[in-house]
């Protein structure tokens, strides 16, 4: 595992509608050292442009994307309980979403969240909650969670259900558009742990940027680094040189920068590739968040 990766890419993702997005941010940290750097795109990134980059990665690249690579499955043995078309595993889920959204522009996922059956599993707004958003015996009204998300709570972070499409916590849209990307990477980029960690070739993992920030010393509940000074404090903890700049910094850029530096620090550590609670079945269906033990 030593020196398996020498290039570390972090992508702060967005599921918003539209062609270009200032909220998508890419950062790269080189294994030989130096500060992480933002890959500039002044007009905002298009999802198709990010896909093109991912399809042309050097072999020893580790990519972390801030999205969910799967949906809850272990809690009731299905992504969409009661739906005859519910896929059997994560790769079939990606393919189903991409198929249903084939006519959506900009790799969006509007058709899936408006699908007559799939829509029933999502919270669409404060007053529009699908009848399948909660399981009948759900202990809370937060929606369903994957095993890795329940484990994240043990780390002190607060993940949101991937079936939630509401407001700033609408991780569901980011995950759905991301799954369209993942479906198009099949056979070209390994997606851990849904794919086994290969001996060579680029690898993509799911990231929760709060975990990276906490790795840089950020306190629980205060993981958004909204100034160059706060970012550089975290980078110092991660053994990285500082980035240039002072004053306010948008959190899309800071999330990507601190995550790239964190991936460089831990990406070649075998312990991070063997989470205690990850089973073959969970890997095949729900996936896992890199950095969750």
Segment roles from a protein language model:
Residues 2-9, 13-293:
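RNase H-like (RuvC/DEDD) metal-dependent nuclease/polynucleotide-processing core
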């Amino acid at each position: 595992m030593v020196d398996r990766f020498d290039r570390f890419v972090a992508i702060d993702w967005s599921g918003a509608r539209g062609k270009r997005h200032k909220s998508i941010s890419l950062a790269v940290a080189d294994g030989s050292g130096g500060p992480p750097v933002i890959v500039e795109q002044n007009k905002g990134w298009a999802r198709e442009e990010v896909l093109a980059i991912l399809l042309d990665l050097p072999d020893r690249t580790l990519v972390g994307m801030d999205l969910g690579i799967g949906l809850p499955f272990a809690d009731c043995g299905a992504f969409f309980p009661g739906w005859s078309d519910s896929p059997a595993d994560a790769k079939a889920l990606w393919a189903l979403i991409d198929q249903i959204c084939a006519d959506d522009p900009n790799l969006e996922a509007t058709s899936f969240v408006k699908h007559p059956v799939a829509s029933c599993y999502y919270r669409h707004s404060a007053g529009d909650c699908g009848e399948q958003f909660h399981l009948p015996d759900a202990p809370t009204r937060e929606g369903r969670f994957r095993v890795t998300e329940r484990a994240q709570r043990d780390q002190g972070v607060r993940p949101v259900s991937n079936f939630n499409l509401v407001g700033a916590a609408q991780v569901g849209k980011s995950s759905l558009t991301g799954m369209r990307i993942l479906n198009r990477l099949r056979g070209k980029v390994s997606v851990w742990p849904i794919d086994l960690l290969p001996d060579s070739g680029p690898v993509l993992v799911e990231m929760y940027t709060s975990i990276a920030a906490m790795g840089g010393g950020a306190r629980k509940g205060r993981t958004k680094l909204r100034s160059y000074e706060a970012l550089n404090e975290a980078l110092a903890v991660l053994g990285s040189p500082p980035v240039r700049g002072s004053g306010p910094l948008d959190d899309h850029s800071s999330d990507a920068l601190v995550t790239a530096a964190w991936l460089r620090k831990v990406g070649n550590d075998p312990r991070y590739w063997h989470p205690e609670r990850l089973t073959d079945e969970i890997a095949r269906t729900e996936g896992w968040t890199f950095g969750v033990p």
